[in-house]
Amino acid sequence: MRTEAGGARAPRGRRARTWLAAGTVLVAGTGAVVALRATSDTGTAAEGPQVVHTSVDSLELTGSAGERVLAARSTKAFRMLAVSWQDPGVRLDGTVRVRTRSSATGTWSDWQALGAGDAQPDPAERDRAGVRGGTAPLWAGPSDGVQVKADGKTLPKGLTVDLVDPGKGGSTTPAMDAAAYAMPADGEETPTDRPTDPETSSAPEQTPSDDPAESTPAPTDSATETPAESTPPASPTAEPSQSTGAGTTAPASPTAPTSTAPPTSASPTAPGYLPSLSAAYPSCASASAVPQTMPSPLPAQPPTTKVPAPPFVTRAGWGADECARDTGYPDYGHTVKAVFVHHTDTTNAYSCADSPSIVRSLYALHLHQGWRDLGYNFLVDKCGTIFEGRFGGAAMPVIGAQTYGFNTDSMGIAAIGTYTDLTGGDSKASTIVGAAPSQAMVTAISRIAAWKLGMSGVSPTGTSSLTEGAKDSYGFTFGKAYTMNAVSGHRNGFATDCPGNQLYAKLDTVRSYAAGPPAGVGVTSVDTPSGPVRSGTGYVTGTTATVRWSTSTPASLLSGAEVLVDGTSVAKVAGTATSAPVKLTSGRHTVQVRATHVSGRTTTSAAVTVTADTTRPTYPTAPSVQLGKGTVNTAGVPVTVSWKAADDNGLRSQAATSPTAKTLTATSTSWPTTAKSATATKFGLTATDLAGNTATASVTGTPTLLQESSAKATGTWTKRSSSSYLGGYSSSSGTKSASLTWTFKGRSVAWIASRASTSGAVQIYVDGTLQTTVDLKSATTAYRQAMWTKSWSSAAQHTLKIVVVGTSGRPTVTTDGIAVLN
């Protein structure tokens, strides 16, 4: 295929006239102000798009051959700058430092050293008349003042500082409009209806070796000594040029007959195919008549791929002035065999809302330096927003201006920002502080690589063979084929530190993300409606559950996920989903998640065990109720409810439901509460198992108070009166062996007494048998205390007898009767 020398484009002067007509103002002695026009719509080809005015103001540096300066001065508003010079083949052997003044605060920035600009078109485009060399750009933000110092042994001629005002407008919302790339439909004028351009239609295809003017200069300031790769292959390996290398697509013969009849329409689901004639040749009021011809030979429409195009902001979306670029179609390669990752080296001090302005600024600088268009094929900001770069159809193998000598059959993705760490392979020519690339940026780069390499059938983790197309690229030999990683850093194809150590270190991640299969796929939980419930190493649910999972591969690189139950897919969801509801039959199951990469490759998680439990809990020990210890009154007699609940898979919770509600633990077997005297009380319980199944149980009891007056007395007893006593009275005795005997029928009994520091002790007999001795001594006085209880499995007639012990120094005991439960 043709290099930058070919293609159906207008001659350089023709585009230049269009540019000048857009509003160029020549400033004597200081440079040129170039006004650009840019649309600010959201990516559709709407009629009458708004205009975003973008301008480049060039100010000349003056001084000696080894020192050029621009004194601190006020300027028109700008946000980006770069320093450029006349000959792009001459490297700036020296240091360029700039500082800018904030238009918001009036404060001057610190001095910043600019590195060399290392994204370049191939020789045919670079060596056109009027093309300039330049430094890396600097995003300064809103500014209205600048100062520049350039020092070196011999500085290039024609040094200027180029100040870019990108205007306001553009969108950060992806809007892929396939209609903007549609081919002429039936009934419209086709390429064969138009005259062909004699300058291009019959021109033989050019190769880099056809240009005798190429030379071999030394590397740029940012060059590393060898273009090494941190992962295999360690460096590009020379091989016979006829070999395509692993994972490559052999190029078609340039002499093969190619039909010029395009398809009638573009794929509605695959944006960015060959642009229409009206898009390639925009209607510009000042443009001279240019024959509108399709590319010849017509590039093949990219093959279909499972990988869908990622969302991206179109050129119209970010505000590209299509009348400023070279009119017509760009040059095309055969297919994209390799992706080169770059950074713009413009600093990271930007907001993502600035990204359209940054892209327009880079576009303006590249045009100002004489390039036919923006050099990069795509740009990505730190928020992960993707911007379409060079015109020609995002899906097409557009030859960019990004990796000198290897622009054909590759594409360049530029990460907006600076990602150096100034160690190892990073050049220290620039003092711009680098940062680590964001996860969103790495993900977006991976997404583009997956799409573009997917159309070529090249694995992102594989390699491709590219042939060096420049005679003067340091470290590479013209005409030799080199094996490159399918996802490479700019430094692997050119002597530069780009894309910076911090981004370069992420290329293995990019390869893995782009190639698939999904990594880190695992089930994180299987939830019941109230959340996940574990039982041992597995989960317990009912017949409905929610399966949740995670992956280390970002969601935008997944096309979908499935939940497998016992190996069968039961739920399919989008790649962005991390959960799905499922229905299960009763019993034990295995659950897995299968995630699908955009490439179609899949990964199935390890299985987790899930038991769908539909069986209610049981009560192996039915509830029973007994009298308990504590303070007694007619409204509340202490009782204790006892039971045992169980479930094959385990209990989640238990609760009391009557006569009062109370939350109990899953392991509870008793519940102390109270019951109203002389009233039948129902004590209700609920047990809930891990799956949410419930069971209920209850028991009913009626407590009755028998006062001391109902007992048979022996010895001396004294009646005491107080509102603190049950019924207002109690009986006391300090006589040793004095006794009270109650006869009752019931299943539980409690003896009630008063306590004080002077209280004595009693012996308790049931049915004539000594049960225990109870000492009533207490540091604090307490009335109506159930001090001792005894229960039976069923109600029967019994006797309870208390006998005064006659404790030395404190013989007196006071009793308030007994409580009986039936």
What are these regions, as identified by a protein language model?
Residues 141-174:
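Ser/Thr/Pro-rich, low-complexity mucin-like regions
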Residues 328-397, 464-467, 479-489, 728-737, ...:
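Secreted/periplasmic proteins that engage bacterial cell-wall peptidoglycan
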Residues 92-94, 553-565, 646-660, 754-764:
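Solvent-exposed loop/turn segments flanking beta-strands in beta-repeat/beta-sandwich domains
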Residues 2-17, 163-251, 256-340, 382-393, ...:
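Basic/polar, cationic surfaces and motifs that engage anionic cell-wall
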Residues 569-576, 660-668:
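Short beta-strand segments within Ig-like beta-sandwich modules, predominantly Fibronectin type-III
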Residues 546-554, 639-648:
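Conserved aromatic anchor
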Residues 45-143, 151-152, 165, 596-598, ...:
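Glycan-recognition surfaces in beta-rich domains, encompassing non-catalytic CBMs
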